[in-house]
């Protein structure tokens, strides 16, 4: 296999890493490429693609607030900026660490609207999401505004991790917002199940921060309700059909006897009694 083929395969592993599991994927890659340890250092573009597409969040040095990494707030050269904190910073895509923080003030035609959206987003995100980050940035020569919400929920002790990503592109001149809501959940106890959804969004809005966030709230609430109905349908339909049926013996279960069994001996049948 050529070096380029190896890099392409390893890059696909990185870009497809489930939420909260990039470090595990990197560890596996290092084990697979132990004979060429420097190969991981050549996968920078894959790490950048993952971080920007997954809206990776990072805490700036000396701050407790998370900021977002995306193509919409990139300044080039692995530097990004955040409107709410009026800062720009360097970001290492491999280690996912921020550094070299500088003051960065957003101005221009959509500057006030962008700040208005962020002000309205703050209480909405705080009320409806845990461990979430949000942001808004002028894009396309200051003609539109990109709005992002990302919420992460990691529960490795229970063998699942999940991420919610919302991206909306606001066109103030047209009075429209277009985008998508993506949900990625990985469950890996006694199996490997991954839920990936992509919901396109189109709506008409007034060009005020409060009105825009009100529409976002309505769209996201409706989609969450749709997801809940889909989960219930899967549980009672496809997933139920996959479950192994318990045998019907028509015999009473002796619960007291079962409670007295010694795990690994009576139930497992292993080892002699002491």
From Swiss-Prot:
Record's keyword terms, sorted: Actin capping, Actin-binding, Cytoplasm
Keyword Cytoplasm set for record: yes
GO molecular function, one term: actin filament binding
Gene Ontology cellular component terms for the protein in this record: actin cortical patch; F-actin capping protein complex
Localization per Swiss-Prot or TrEMBL: Cytoplasm
InterPro entries named among the record's database cross-references: CapZ_alpha, CapZ_alpha/beta, CapZ_alpha/beta_2, CapZ_alpha_1, F-actin_cap_asu_CS
Protein's GO biological process: actin cytoskeleton organization; barbed-end actin filament capping
Function: F-actin-capping proteins bind in a Ca(2+)-independent manner to the fast growing ends of actin filaments (barbed end) thereby blocking the exchange of subunits at these ends. Unlike other capping proteins (such as gelsolin and severin), these proteins do not sever actin filaments.
Record's subunit section: Heterodimer of an alpha and a beta subunit.
Family: Belongs to the F-actin-capping protein alpha subunit family.
Protein name (Swiss-Prot/TrEMBL): F-actin-capping protein subunit alpha
Native source organism of the sequence: Chaetomium thermophilum (strain DSM 1495 / CBS 144.50 / IMI 039719) (Thermochaetoides thermophila)
């Amino acid at each position: 296999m050529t070096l380029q083929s190896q890099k392409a395969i390893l890059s696909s592993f990185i870009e497809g890493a489930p939420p909260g599991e990039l470090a595990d994927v990197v560890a596996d890659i290092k084990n697979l490429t132990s004979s060429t340890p420097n190969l991981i250092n050549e996968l920078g573009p894959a790490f950048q693609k993952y971080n920007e597409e997954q809206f990776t969040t990072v805490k700036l040095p000396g701050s407790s607030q998370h900021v977002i990494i995306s193509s919409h707030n990139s300044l080039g050269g692995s530097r990004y900026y955040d409107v709410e904190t009026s800062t720009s910073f360097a970001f290492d895509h491999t280690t996912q660490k921020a550094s070299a923080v500088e003051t960065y003030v957003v101005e221009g035609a959509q500057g006030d609207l962008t700040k208005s959206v962020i002000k309205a987003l703050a209480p909405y995100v705080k009320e409806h999401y845990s461990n979430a980050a949000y942001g808004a940035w002028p894009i396309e020569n200051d003609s539109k505004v990109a709005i992002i919400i990302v919420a992460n929920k990691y529960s490795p002790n229970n063998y699942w991790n999940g991420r919610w990503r919302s991206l909306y592109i606001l066109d103030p001149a047209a009075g429209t917002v277009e985008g998508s809501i993506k949900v990625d959940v990985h469950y890996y106890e006694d199996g490997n199940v991954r839920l990936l959804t992509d919901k396109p969004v189109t709506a008409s809005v007034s060009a005020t921060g409060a009105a825009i966030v009100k529409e976002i709230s309505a769209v996201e609430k409706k989609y969450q309700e749709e997801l809940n109905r889909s989960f219930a349908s899967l549980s009672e339909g496809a997933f139920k059909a996959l479950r192994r049926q318990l045998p019907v013996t028509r015999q009473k279960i002796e619960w007291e006897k079962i409670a007295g069994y010694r795990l690994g001996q009576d139930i497992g049948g292993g080892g002699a009694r002491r």
